[in-house]
Amino acid sequence: MPGIVTRFAPSPTGFLHIGGARTALFNWLYAKHHGGRFLLRIEDTDRKRSTQEAIDAIIEGLRWLGMSYDGEIVYQSKRIERHKEVANLLVEKGRAYHCYCPEDEVAEKKAKAREEGKIYKHKCTTKPPSCHPSSRHWKNMWSRAGMTSGVRSVVRFKVPDSQEIVIDDKIYGQIKVNSDQLDDIVILRSDNTPTYIFAVVVDDHDAGITDIIRGSDHLTNTFKHLLIYQALDFDIPRFAHVPLIHGEDGNKLSKRHGATSVCDYEKMGILPKAMRNYLLRLGWSHGNDEIISDEQAIEWFNLESIGRSPARLDFKKLEHLNNHYISNMSNEDILTLMLRENTLTDKKKGYLLQGLTELKKRANYLTELLDLAKFYIQDPPLDLSEEAEQIVKSNLDIIKLLASFLSKIGDENWNKGFLSSQIKECAKLHDMKISDVYHSLRAPITGVMDAPGIIDIMVILGKDECIRRLQAI
């Protein structure tokens, strides 16, 4: 499908949440699959709620996820003159008009209709359709409404009566609604700024967007968008509305379900690859495949494989994926991620590079891995877990004996095979249980009792460091 152009168009009123990240991913993959372009537009016309902090977080979230966009970022707020130009064109064509109805009254009528279970369809009561604002009839209407020439209007798009509006959605199929269910659409606010409903149509048209993939919560807006597209004789893009993401309990996703923003997952120690894989599988599938590389995702992605039911968050599945990607990552790359804000000596980096081979199999998160590996970089005396501290207190004599015994082993013999045989010999010689000996080594050398094999750790740390830790107790 040539010439595909998709976009991600978040509103910067908060951080990049998981639903938005999935929408961005689907648009990115669809464009990549078809050799097209993926654009980023910041919809910041709501100046009261939009913040630079949120804009920065969205851009950083996409960067962290590894989704690069084509061209420059488009800021909707910088296109207001274009929006006003198109709105005026609609007024000139008779497809939109200035409405002076008090906004609080309109809101009150809508609220009352909702309470009564009815649909409120607003039609301006202050301007007859055939009346021009400069006419005597128009001025009389102002007077009767208690208005003055200083009253500021909104611009409303005229929704045609009794027209069937049809969306050919790539996920839900054909969806219809009658225009009588829609009220006239505000396209310019009283301060002359565009509403989302209107600006998005103009911006998508001007950017040459061919395919719009977004959440199903936008479905009702799409009916309005279609009317505006038709009134302007714009080419209508293809639409695909993706079911929303629910929490594990099946309810709409909210903060009570835990981490919902991308930056939360980054702080937890989720890898970008794992997050992309996880987001992809939230509502999209390729047979029974769970582990999907970026190359496979680009090759396989299609809209037909997106389900119609809401996807549910599954943190256990995310942990499983993250563990897979951590386990298959090189020790050097993991070390780079772990030490972004830490400086270590070359010796301690060497400990970690060797120790990560075993430790990374145990970690579901990078933060967890850093905690598991901290004994490699601590200086004695180590911080002891409660269990390790109890063992040290109960086995001080054994620890001193082991320090003396191990100090007599030559550096050339400090390897797994020789150490194992000598430690067993020491236990036998001093009539000690081998389990007590291993515990008495593990507690002071690692500070924890659930680390990997103690002999492997001792080989990595080397003779001098092991003796130093045993003697520091």
Swiss-Prot record:
A motif ('KMSKS' region) lies at residues 252-256. Keywords: Aminoacyl-tRNA synthetase, ATP-binding, Cytoplasm, Ligase, Nucleotide-binding, Protein biosynthesis. It holds the Pfam family Anticodon_2. A motif ('HIGH' region) lies at residues 10-20. GO terms for molecular function: ATP binding; glutamate-tRNA ligase activity; tRNA binding; zinc ion binding. The lineage of its organism: Bacteria, Pseudomonadati, Pseudomonadota, Alphaproteobacteria, Rickettsiales. It catalyses: tRNA(Glu) + L-glutamate + ATP = L-glutamyl-tRNA(Glu) + AMP + diphosphate. One of its GO terms (biological process) is glutamyl-tRNA aminoacylation. This is Glutamate--tRNA ligase 1. Catalyzes the attachment of glutamate to tRNA(Glu) in a two-step reaction: glutamate is first activated by ATP to form Glu-AMP and then transferred to the acceptor end of tRNA(Glu). Its EC number is 6.1.1.17. Monomer. Coiled coil: none annotated. SUPFAM superfamilies: An anticodon-binding domain of class I aminoacyl-tRNA synthetases, Nucleotidylyl transferase. GO terms for cellular component: cytosol. ATP binds at K255. It comes from Wolbachia pipientis wMel. It is an enzyme of class 6 (ligase). It is found in: Cytoplasm. It comes from the Bacteria.
